[in-house]
Amino acid sequence: MARSKATDPPADLLGPVQGEVSWFCCGTAWGPCSSTGKGACGTCNSGSLQHAWPNTSDACWSITRPDRCGVSLSRRTCGYRHRVTALCSGASVVTAIADCGPQTDLFCGERSCCGATCADNRLIDLTPAAYSQIASLSSGLRPVEISSA
Amino acid sequence: MHGIAASQPYVIAFFLLWAGLMKLLSRRMRAQAGRTALARLSGPARAVPALRLVGLGELAVAAALLLPPLHLLDAVAAALLSAGFLVYLAYASVAAPASSCGCLGTHSRPVDVRAFARAGLLLAAALLTALGTRPAAPGAGAPGTVTGVQAGLEAGVKAGVKAADGLAAPVPAVIVLEVIVLLALSAELDRYWLTPLRRLLVRLRRPLAAPPQERVPLEASLHLLRRSPAYCSAAAGLTSDVLETWDEDGMRFVVYGARDRTAVFAVPLSGDDPGAVRVALVAEPPLSGSPA
Amino acid sequence: MRSRRDVLRSAVLGGGAGVVAATAMGSLGPEAAFAAQKTAQKVEPGAPDPDFAEGRIRSIKDNTLLVLGSNLVFHTIRVVDGTSLWKLGPVPFDAARPGDGLYARGVRMPDGMLAAESVWLNIVNIRGHIKNIAGQTLRLDHNGHEVLCHVVPGKSVAIHSESPPTADLSMLKVSQHVQILGAWRPDTNEVDIATVFSPH
């Protein structure tokens, strides 16, 4: 597992940060998603333009631990807006924080590429509604750029 | 059978010591207190103090069981604690089904049938201890009253003891078996024996070692496609997922909708060079076709 | 179908008639899209996206799916020739069955119907620890719930970070954390695997 010292200050403070994005379901749902619940903010729904962020609180950070992958991210709370831009297509979506996640440290060092552009580490998870605006749900994982909206 | 009953306080005390020390000393367990069902019961802010309180209670009962003389009250306290565990587990499985129990250590799995079985076994051991414990004689210390119910139960135990004596059960073997069963029911220990065992079996049996497939899975081609510069150049215009694919002349053709046009990609079936993927946009509306 | 495939094949391999070069499309390049992102988003962040639907198919009539959303809102989804359907891979319309879960993206019509561009049937994207591997199945611990994940020969692949996808899933280990993208078998805790994403 590629673990290294976290960057200081947070990588996303001064400008956009690149990482991997996946999607997750939340709210009322079918199948294995039905037990997920409405997320850490209590507002999460698969059909809304929302996302999960690894640093919404101390408790959240202790679960996701992006610092173990060498990435420090700013504390952003429920409702904060990020813009996620697919690195190759340039398609983007602005979403609001509704949950804590992803568990960055469990996939430390993972890399996704598109053309000559690559991004490391899972830094954000989108709801299906948001993810499907910038990529196909069947792709599962894409490299993106994340910035404050 | 007397030997089995006499050994139960030590078995129970062992597990209570383990549980109590983990709750009081494990920093990781305190860090994860917020994710246990106890946090749901006590409120997240009071999860750590509640964990410590339960730990102290477990240590106190363990000490009472270990320090002679063994009193009926000690066994009753152990039985009440075990019954409390069962009630707590039932609460956890209903009120916080996704939370871990925070019983003997740190693991994130929620309460399952094994946790109930372990708590039930501990309760049975505590009851056996209570029934096998002679109440203290009046004037010899703390009061102990034998109720009619207990007298009846004791008579039952004695009858059972006689029957068991007839079987001449090897007491140490039964106790070892009991401890092994209790340990095996502890999900907290799975990573030390169950996971390595499963890994070993997987290594020996190689269950997923599939014979080489003649056909390249579509997902493998799509992964190469998504990594390609050709896909990058056209991805912003794609409006659908894959509409149609077919294989021809060593290439896999993949068709997407691109608004009122069709995007067709040619992905080599052999090799792993994203640069070899080609794309064209055809000025005709997409038609869905049967997948290859 | 054959002749159409010939047209598409010759277009991508040899510049047949009717081909529009990607560069000639102008707006398709990423630079243009990055510029276009400055335009305001139609839907407020955090709000439900009207061009997206989620739920389970109640009935199918002609080319229309009647879907009951998990939030108990009904959606009428129209599937046309240009609509892609996914169910462990691209499938024709007749693969859709009542009871299937779905996500759909398209364009919401004034009459409330969703004209679908993409429909994903039973798609799930779950993360968890592999509890056990036996036969052609993985037992996944997903948020404390066991999900039985089936390897489908010829379809399931594993992606180990940067390595090319492989149909050989024997590198997966008990207790490792993975992401599984697959198709749920309705009303069960079972999933057919499309892709296993493994960080190592």
Where on the chain are the PLM-derived regions?
Chain A
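Secreted/periplasmic proteins
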Residues: 2-149
